[in-house]
């Protein structure tokens, strides 16, 4: 399975990981200096869940993001699936 949420469209993002040295000014130091920068990826918080669909009258096994799970609690599974289909996820 991919790392993309089928209900919200969340997918991995790219960013940087910074290596720093020095003592922070807050701690009476001269300040922090960046000594290196490495590419990294930020992954969405994915969860595999079995959810009951009342329309299809069966369980659906979905790998969804944690924010999609909160959205399902708030709106209901059928509304979230309809919304995802209309947005093209």
From Swiss-Prot:
Quote the InterPro entries the UniProt record gives.
Answer: Ribosomal_bL28, Ribosomal_bL28/bL31-like_sf, Ribosomal_bL28_bact-type, Ribosomal_bL28_sf
* Entry's Gene Ontology BP terms: translation
Pfam families in the cross-refs = Ribosomal_L28 (PF00830)
Top-rank taxon: Bacteria
Q: Which residues form a coiled coil?
A: none
User: Which SUPFAM superfamilies does the record associate with it?
Assistant: L28p-like
Listed A to Z, the keywords are: Ribonucleoprotein, Ribosomal protein
Give the CC-aspect GO terms: ribonucleoprotein complex; ribosome
Record flagged with keyword Ribosomal protein? yes
Q: List, in alphabetical order, the Gene Ontology terms for molecular function in this entry.
A: structural constituent of ribosome
* NCBIfam families (UniProt xref): L28
Q: Which family does it belong to?
A: Belongs to the bacterial ribosomal protein bL28 family.
Kindly give the HAMAP family that the UniProt entry links to this protein. Ribosomal_bL28 (MF_00373)
Q: What is this protein called?
A: Large ribosomal subunit protein bL28
This chain's source organism reads: Chlamydia felis (strain Fe/C-56)
